[in-house]
């Protein structure tokens, strides 16, 4: 149960990073948010969240490169962001179900 709680907290941190990106817009993401995105992409792999890891790293690459462009195309970033948000949503839902199942299995009849 502790591992599930740790994973839930991590997924919520990823959601928060996505919220910060959404709030600032792709063309003006804060440097600290970009740094968090890169760091958390590596941590996601440690949790076995390989899709999230890859999507976050690719998103970081696009946003980092676009900082130095006058007119950047964010099409790929928007698609990655959408897929990442949906992935995180379903990960959190699955985690909820796992926690409920575990709670039900450990209750005495």
Segments the model singles out, each with a brief description of its role:
Residues 1-18, 50, 68-109:
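Amphipathic, coiled-coil-like alpha-helical segments
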Residues 10-17, 36, 55-59:
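Amphipathic, well-ordered alpha-helical segments in soluble domains
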Residues 17-28, 44-47, 63-70, 91:
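Secondary-structure edge/capping motif, primarily at the C-terminal ends of alpha-helices
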Residues 26-36:
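Alpha-helical segments in soluble extracytoplasmic regions
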Residues 33, 47-63:
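Short, well-ordered alpha-helical segments
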Residues 38-42:
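Amphipathic alpha-helical segments within well-ordered protein domains
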């Amino acid at each position: 149960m502790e591992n599930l709680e740790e994973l839930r907290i991590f997924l919520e941190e990823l959601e928060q990073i996505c919220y910060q990106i959404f709030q600032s817009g792709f063309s003006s993401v804060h440097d600290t948010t970009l740094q968090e995105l890169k760091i958390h992409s590596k941590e996601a792999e440690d949790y076995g969240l390989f899709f999230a890891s890859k999507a976050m790293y690719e998103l970081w690459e696009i946003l980092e490169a676009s900082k130095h462009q006058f007119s950047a195309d964010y099409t790929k970033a928007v698609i990655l962001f959408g897929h990442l948000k949906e992935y995180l949503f379903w990960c959190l839902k699955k985690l909820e179900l796992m926690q409920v199942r575990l709670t039900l299995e450990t209750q005495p009849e």
